């Protein structure tokens, strides 16, 4: 019998890898890097209203101190001025979020509807789609994100429950502008 790796104590430096490090997840996130035009429809339960708006989302990979973690910056801003943000001040018209992958989780410095940090658990449907599950304060968020047509398009649907009542449903059709 041949020992492939006879060393029992491998040294990975200061930042050892997580056993469940998923290169597919890192690869999927790298496919999302770039500037996206996001055409959105929001269905809001409270107001019983539907809104359509266009946003820009920029996703950037950041340098990381750990070779085992992938860090990202997400920035968003509207294509033009919308009454939506005046009528619904809980939504941020523009903003920035830093997050990093650790295993099958996305650790966020803040969320879209909150400045609280938290974790999104990630499930991989196939090589093109991920599901993100997040909980913070009284919110439970379920987001499906699918890459299409050689990563030139993304389709996202987001369901948001507050205190176990469905409050927001969002559909986002996104077109990659800059890779």
Question: What are these model-derived regions, one by one?
Answer:
Residues 2-17, 80-179:
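Calycin-type beta-barrel ligand-binding domains and close structural analogs
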Residues 1-94, 168, 176-179:
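Amphipathic/hydrophobic helical signal segments and adjacent flexible N-terminal regions
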